[in-house]
């Protein structure tokens, strides 16, 4: 079972396993399962809905979200996946994705941490444009950024980005549409901007997408 770290890690950070590996606030646990039970096409054929849908199933833009249980600490942490609820809260409230506390902010903006671009054809890293980058990763605080770099293999060459205005751009998830037989078919995961009235009725969101603007 996870427990609160007592070293230099933030006080709210959970650890897991005999090596006491830090578990990010947004990380999904194996006890948190996604359920599509009750997902149907609306009677008028205009899009997706839940048979027992409640207001909390849609966000302020009317986009339907995948249902995921909240069970922090139950099972094993999946470092590759994020809890839909905690990711969304952290992205909206500018919370650190690792400890869940306030993310780091200076006059240059909020701190984001991401892997550097892969090497180019000649073996040299080709800089990617940062301005306008879409990300589902919430911001991070400075101590947790250092912690993440020490523990995450994909951050061997980290890129620290400051965004003065990380704008809520849309959502990440997938389209779910009926097949000729009436069965619902899932598409590959993709981004969808808010305001796409044609696509939104058939989209099932799992994460909030931020656009990093005014970056340094």
Where are these regions (language model features)?
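Long acidic/polar interaction regions in large eukaryotic complex-forming proteins
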Residues: 78-84, 91-95, 115-118, 123
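N-terminal alpha-helical interaction blocks
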Residues: 1-91, 163-216
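Conserved binding-pocket/active-site segment within a compact domain
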Residues: 112-204
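Beta-hairpin (beta-strand-turn-beta-strand) motif
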Residues: 101-102, 116
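Short metal-coordination and nucleic-acid-contact micro-motifs, chiefly zinc-binding Cys/His arrays
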Residues: 89-95, 134-137
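Short cysteine-rich clusters marking metal-coordination/redox-active sites
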Residues: 96-100, 141
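Short, non-ligating residues that shape and space the ligands of small metal-coordination modules
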Residues: 103-109, 150-151
């Amino acid at each position: 079972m996870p427990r609160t770290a007592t070293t230099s890690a933030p006080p709210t950070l959970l650890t897991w396993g005999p090596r006491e590996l830090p578990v990010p606030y947004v990380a999904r646990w194996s006890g948190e399962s996604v359920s599509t039970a009750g997902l149907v096409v609306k009677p008028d054929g205009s899009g997706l809905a839940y048979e027992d849908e409640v207001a909390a199933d849609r966000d302020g833009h009317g986009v339907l979200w995948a249902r995921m249980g909240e069970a922090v600490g139950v099972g094993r942490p999946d470092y590759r996946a994020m809890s839909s609820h905690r990711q969304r809260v952290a992205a909206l409230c500018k919370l650190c994705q690792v400890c869940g506390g306030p993310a780091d902010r200076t006059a240059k903006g909020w701190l984001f941490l991401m892997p550097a671009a892969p090497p180019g054809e000649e073996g040299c890293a080709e800089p990617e444009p940062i301005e306008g980058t879409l990300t589902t990763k919430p911001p991070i605080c400075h101590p947790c950024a250092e912690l993440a770099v020490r523990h995450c293999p994909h951050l061997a060459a980290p890129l620290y980005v400051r965004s003065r205005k990380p704008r809520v751009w849309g959502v990440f998830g997938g389209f779910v549409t009926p097949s000729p037989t009436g069965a619902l078919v899932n598409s590959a995961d993709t981004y969808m901007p808010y305001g796409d009235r044609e696509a939104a009725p058939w989209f099932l969101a799992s994460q909030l997408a931020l656009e990093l603007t005014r970056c340094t």
